[in-house]
């Protein structure tokens, strides 16, 4: 693959994208790599990743990584984006808490009913044992 047949993917140079603005890197200037590929400046709003062989899988992974980085930057810089998500999560959490409280109340009610039935069963067993003890051995 030569510089002339480059498929158009934008790549980033290690030095220009990873050095902070105060380190003397030229800002807002489109550069190029050694083989002539375009390189965005370090303070560019887009972050792109280089693909080695240009396979469809690498291109898709590069695009996904770039989109994820852009989304992460957008979330960090746009707090208004987070507030509806936080309130939505809080309302879902509140709804879950309400459902859990209702389930715990039902469980408590069922536990009380089970205790009543267990006591009745114990009473019946005692009555059966008393009847067996009071009846003659061959009367059955």
UniProtKB/Swiss-Prot annotation:
One of its GO terms (molecular function) is hexon binding. Structural component of the virion that forms triskelion structures consisting of three molecules that stabilize three hexon trimers at the center of each icosahedral facet and fixes the peripentonal hexons. Dispensable for assembly. During virus entry, recruits the anterograde motor kinesin-1 to the capsid docked at the nuclear pore complex thereby subjecting the docked capsid to a pulling force. The resulting tension leads to capsid disruption, dispersion of capsid fragments toward cell periphery and eventually viral DNA entry into the host nucleus. GO terms for cellular component: host cell nucleus; viral capsid, decoration. Keywords: Capsid decoration protein, Capsid protein, Coiled coil, Host nucleus, Host-virus interaction, Phosphoprotein, Virion, Virus entry into host cell. The modification Phosphoserine is found at residue 135. It comes from Human adenovirus C serotype 2. Three N-terminal domains of hexon-interlacing protein form triskelions between hexon capsomers. The gene is IX. This protein is only encoded by mastadenoviruses, and may therefore play a role in mammals tropism. Residues 100-127 form a coiled coil. Belongs to the adenoviridae hexon-interlacing protein family. Induction: Expressed in the intermediate phase of the viral replicative cycle. The keyword Cytoplasm does not apply. This is Hexon-interlacing protein. GO terms for biological process: symbiont entry into host cell; uncoating of virus. It is found in: Virion; Host nucleus. It comes from the Viruses. Homotrimer. Interacts with hexon protein; this interaction tethers the hexons together. Self-interacts with adjacent proteins. Interacts with kinesin light chain KLC1; this interaction leads to capsid disruption at the nuclear pore complex during virus entry into host cell.
């Amino acid at each position: 693959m030569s510089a002339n047949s480059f498929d158009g993917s934008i790549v980033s140079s290690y030095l220009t994208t990873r050095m902070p603005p105060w380190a003397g890197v030229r800002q807002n200037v489109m550069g190029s790599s050694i083989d002539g590929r375009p390189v965005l400046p370090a303070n560019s709003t887009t972050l792109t990743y280089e693909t080695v062989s240009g396979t469809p899988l690498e291109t898709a992974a590069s695009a996904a990584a770039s989109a994820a980085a852009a989304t992460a930057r957008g979330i960090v810089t746009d707090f208004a984006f987070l507030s509806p998500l936080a309130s939505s999560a809080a309302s879902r959490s509140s709804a879950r808490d309400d459902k859990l409280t209702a389930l715990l109340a039902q469980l408590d009610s069922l536990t009380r009913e089970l205790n009543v039935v267990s006591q009745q069963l114990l009473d019946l067993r005692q009555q059966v044992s008393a009847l067996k003890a009071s009846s003659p051995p061959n009367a059955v």
